[in-house]
A protein has these predicted regions:
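Membrane-interfacial terminal anchoring regions of lipid-handling membrane enzymes
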Residues: 46-49, 97, 120, 129-155
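Soluble extracytoplasmic domains of inner/organellar membrane proteins
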Residues: 5, 11, 28-30, 41-44, ...
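A conditional alpha-helix N-cap/helix-loop micro-motif detector
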Residues: 34-37, 71
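Residues at or immediately preceding the N-termini of alpha-helices
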Residues: 33-34, 131
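Catalytic core of membrane glycerolipid acyltransferases/transacylases, capturing the structured
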Residues: 1-33
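A cross-family acyltransferase "interaction/gating" segment
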Residues: 15-17, 49-55, 64-133
């Protein structure tokens, strides 16, 4: 089970919040800036020592299909984790936004002909890249693959 980096407010949700806590989630308070990053880094190092993978949305949240990374850029937190933990990053593209809209707990599988979310596991990015190169590669690979999955589902 991966340690999921998530906004702290999610741990207060009934049932699922307890699940997040018990599963080793890494809650962060977004408005705490550098302190949130430091805490996230400490918890991420603990997760790595326990041989756990981590999951983070690089834009800090789920993003609706069609919203460009220019409108909702990739945030430095994902690079911070990458640089602090020194482990490979495995980018994952998906088309979940088509059936699970942002700001909604309700899912709409009938919107897709396949009735299911498709994930595409992309080649891992080895540790050690400079920030600009890492973020550029991560963004390009995820955005291209996600757009391809969305286009395929809608065609």
């Amino acid at each position: 089970m991966p340690s999921i980096v998530l906004k702290k407010a999610l741990i207060f949700l009934p049932v699922i919040g307890l699940y997040f806590l018990r599963s080793g989630a890494i809650p962060i308070t977004r408005d705490q800036g550098i302190n949130a990053l430091k805490k996230m880094g400490r918890n991420a190092k603990i997760a790595v020592k326990k041989n756990r993978s981590m999951m983070i949305f690089p834009q800090g949240t789920r993003v609706s299909p069609g919203v460009s990374s220019k409108e909702k850029p990739y945030l430095p937190g994902v690079f911070f984790l990458y640089s602090q933990t020194k482990v490979p990053v495995v980018p994952v593209a998906h088309n979940a936004g088509l059936i699970w809209p942002k700001n909604s707990f309700i899912k709409y599988p009938e919107r897709l002909s396949s009735k299911s979310v498709t994930l595409k596991i992309l080649p891992e990015i080895q540790p050690g890249l400079p920030k600009k190169e890492f973020l550029s590669r991560l963004e390009t690979e995820i955005e291209n693959a996600s757009n391809e999955l969305i286009k395929k589902e809608l065609s």
